[in-house]
Amino acid sequence: MLNFDKESILEYSKVGCSGVLALASNYLASIDDKYTVIVSDILHHSGLVNIDEKYKDRVINVGIAEQNEIGVATGLVNQGFEVYASVYTGFAVARALDQIKVSMGYMQMPIKIIAFDSGFNDSSLGLVYNLKE
């Protein structure tokens, strides 16, 4: 079980977003057989490379395909899965926005988006990772 007392929160802050996502994913996968995470080629950056071996089949890497990530998530939600989509913030806003509007807005699919690194956090990766919108 994940705790949210002062000591636990201090420990979570030491491992960062990706470490907490791995901890949360292990916990959620242990209590929910339908828990699934979809990533768009950010398995290492999201920390999901550290998910327990017994839950590896719950992580789907669609490659550099943020638009398709939302489409795959929609299909899985439609089949009863609890889906979280992990994506760079800039790519969720710019590349997958149409799919987000249709799938989550119009179709009301309860996909949870976990967005990483907004702003200039990943400038070393190139200009496309800088979120200026």
Where are these regions (language model features)?
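Thiamine diphosphate
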Residues: 1-133
